[in-house]
Amino acid sequence: MCGAEKVRHMLMGEQVLKKWKKSKKMTVAFGGILVMSVVIGGCGGREDAKKSIKIGISVYDQYDTFVSEMMKDFNDYATKKEEETGVAINIDTYNASASQSTQNSQVENMITEGCDVICVNLVDRTDPTAIIDLAEKNNIPVIFFNRELVEEDLERWTRLYYVGAQAFESGIMQGELAAEAFLTDQSLDKNGDGIFQYVVLEGEAGHQDAIVRTEYSVSTMIDSGVEVEKLGYAIANWNRAQAQTKMAQLMSQFGDSIELVIANNDDMALGAIDALKASGLTKDEWPAVIGIDGTDVGLEAVKNKEMIGTVYN
């Protein structure tokens, strides 16, 4: 690798790490808003203020790497907050296993168990009605996070909140990294036609975040002066194993015409890398792969020059 190439990877790595630090701030903000909401709702400033808070959390899939890392950060933050305030923070975490009906039952159980606040990483962002109705009936605040519900639903009751990154920002930064890579590394233009031929590994069919991330990633590349051509796409449901299968199918269909893999999250980007490794191609023959989330494993893949970048979520 020439000196210029080494510098490019070092600079991109630094940029990625800066963006990851920003995502850590989002997690801390989530914890701060969560604890503050509970304090305002039930503990703040009264002589009879409770000395403990019970928080129920339901995640759409505990095996999603980003969600798993976010929950670890949140628990670490809660421990720190306990030490600062002297208020015991008890957290019960549930895995909805990608089932909205399961998640609805979990929320009902949280209410029965006496949770002071409920946090929900929605399975189906278009179907929060049962959760909202249960919470409103029992006057328990709900903080939705990471998977944004429809705005009209969020406005149904004053004790509903949402915390999460803006999907378009992640898409813009992903597009910036991809454009920078293409414009500074001629080897990525494998057929030499001056066009970045790409495929997309999309999170979920019709999911707002997936659609917005892809749209802004592509439009940002174009705005940066990169001519692009979409070869194909596949739905991989944010899942690494599904992404490996879908990437293998895309490779079978488009072969070495693929110059860029745009993945809506790091797990799917890593699934694409798994498929590339299984294909027997050398790294020099791989298309560029880029993700979103800034997960630990995603950053490790950037460090190992398997991914050209990842951005915060």
Where are the language model's segments positioned?
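Basic, mixed-charge low-complexity alpha-helical segments
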Residues: 35-36, 46
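Sec-dependent N-terminal signal peptides
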Residues: 24-34
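C-terminal motif of bacterial Sec signal peptides marking the signal peptidase cleavage site
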Residues: 39-42
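A residue-level marker of the well-folded mature domains of exported/periplasmic proteins
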Residues: 13, 18-25, 44-313
